[in-house]
């Protein structure tokens, strides 16, 4: 198939090639033709069906979504150029594989991350900064006990839940989730679970492409993706919970709709339209790229 166009970072035809050099591709085959990296697609979002050159020299990571396949030669070219490849759900609502997230050609940020985490004082400093973001304001300088900060945030989140319930006209009886009997949860709690899963996947993508250390969380511990949980929580009030309550209201207005695909699709649209993953990357850089 002859090339129909050039898939560049500055073209409006590719809405997901963002300021961090992330290129989103779906419904097509990434392969090498005549020495060039080419994506042949059936079309998705604003991109018409056709074959497109990929300017991999300008791309930091390719995020390959549903319907995407990649050839061995394409993997070889990407590896040679230190261009990452991640297999993701539509618009980043899932992360399936990070086999080639080479990240920045430097260990500086990972080293800084580890150093900040290893020192008890700086670990608390970063955790406090995260709580400031989550709480939307400055904290008293003497407030360094994380348990008390968790209590403050817990009270604030309860208000966020109620405000969103009032705003969208959704009945709210509290946050509940029975892992042993998930079907017993009400619609809005199901929606929150699905929104949390999507935003957490977005945070894992942001952690992968920044070359930071997933296991080293400043607030969360034990999980192999503790840092992604930290980052996802920074967007709970602004992104995750609004998705859940909007999805719940949509299902209530249209009986017969399933909350899981509704919440997932709404999450994908939000991640794309509000540049959530680029914002997460910026947030990671702001937290870790600090003056020593």
Model regions and ranges:
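Short, exposed beta-strand/loop patches in secreted or surface proteins that constitute
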Residues: 29-31, 54
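Active-site helix-to-loop segments that bind/position phosphate- or nucleotide-bearing substrates
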Residues: 1-21, 27-28, 35, 80, ...
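Glycine/small-residue-rich interface belts in oligomeric ring/scaffold proteins
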Residues: 41-46, 50-106
């Amino acid at each position: 198939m002859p090339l129909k166009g050039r898939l560049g970072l500055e073209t409006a035809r590719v809405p997901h090639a963002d300021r961090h050099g992330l290129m989103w591709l779906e419904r097509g085959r990434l392969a090498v033709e005549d020495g060039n990296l080419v994506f042949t697609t059936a079309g998705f979002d604003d991109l018409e069906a056709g074959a497109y050159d990929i300017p991999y020299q300008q791309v930091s990571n390719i995020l390959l979504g549903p319907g995407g396949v990649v050839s061995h030669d394409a993997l070889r070219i990407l590896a040679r150029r230190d261009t990452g490849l991640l297999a993701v759900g539509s618009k980043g609502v899932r992360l399936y594989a990070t086999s080639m997230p080479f990240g920045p050609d430097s260990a500086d940020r990972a080293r800084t991350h580890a150093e900040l985490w290893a020192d008890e004082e700086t670990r608390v400093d970063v955790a406090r900064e995260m709580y400031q973001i989550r709480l939307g304001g400055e904290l008293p300088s003497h407030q360094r006990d994380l348990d008390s900060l968790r209590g403050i945030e817990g009270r604030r989140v309860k208000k966020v839940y109620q405000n969103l319930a009032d705003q969208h006209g959704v009945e709210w009886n509290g946050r509940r989730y029975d892992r042993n009997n998930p079907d017993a949860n009400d619609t809005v709690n199901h929606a929150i679970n699905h929104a949390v899963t999507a935003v957490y996947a977005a945070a894992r993508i942001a952690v992968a492409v920044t070359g930071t250390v997933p296991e080293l969380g400043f607030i969360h511990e034990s999980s192999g993706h503790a840092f992604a949980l930290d980052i996802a929580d920074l967007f709970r009030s602004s992104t995750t919970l609004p998705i859940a309550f909007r999805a719940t209201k949509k299902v209530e207005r249209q009986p017969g709709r399933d909350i899981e695909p509704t919440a997932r699709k709404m999450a994908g649209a939000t991640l794309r339209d509000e540049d959530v993953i680029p914002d997460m990357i910026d947030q990671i850089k702001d937290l870790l790229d600090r003056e020593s």
